[in-house]
Amino acid sequence: MHIKKTDRYLDKKAEKLLKAINLNVDYDKFIILVSGDVAFSGKKEEYKLAFKFFGTLVAKSMQEYGKKPTIYVVPGNHDINFADKSRSRSEVNGILKNGITQKNLRDEYAKFDDFWIFANYNQCFLEDKEIDRKIVDLNDVKIQINLINSALLSTFNDYDKDVDDGCHYISPNKLNLIKKLDDIDYSITIMHHPEQYFSWDCRKELKAAILENTDLLILGHEHNSMTYEICSNNGESFVTIQ
């Protein structure tokens, strides 16, 4: 979305989004999944506009269809407020080499402070800043939605113009939160970055956890649309929408 203070016509964009969704069908629930980059640079004024945009979306949905959407959102790298200070790949690699500490994580979480206000308003990431699990009942179908923060240790304005694939981090002890519960019929995982953006150790564990516990993976970041299926040697698979 990359909402910023120079954006115009947000109300019209909300109307177009609503028209793209066929709400004349008798849905049991109306859920909007946002795969990150709500803001352009993680600043407070950008989230004020995001509140306005989604407020318009909800109001028009209620007015035209009598349905209030539930909004689930994950952060992207544009949802981080770097306070206009650059962070290079070499700096991130230094943090990874020394081992992630609790202070490192607290510092990372703090960079999302204005995003958390927006996410918490939508009942997301209230208890954990890395993974949030939602359970939705659709008639006789029970759906688990895993929200993953894939943007920890993102770079910003790297002077070497280097991309940060292979740098991102997720706490290995948090991955049990995406475990598909026994009574779940269908599992959806949503995160902003594809798995290749994570550091090698994180990538292996995250990919295995997703493969074992996810039926549908929704990604952002790459700015190109594609749908594909990933299969393992033991027959496990999931569909990815990017």
Regions from the PLM with identified roles:
Residues 196-242:
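Conserved beta-sheet core of the metallophosphoesterase superfamily
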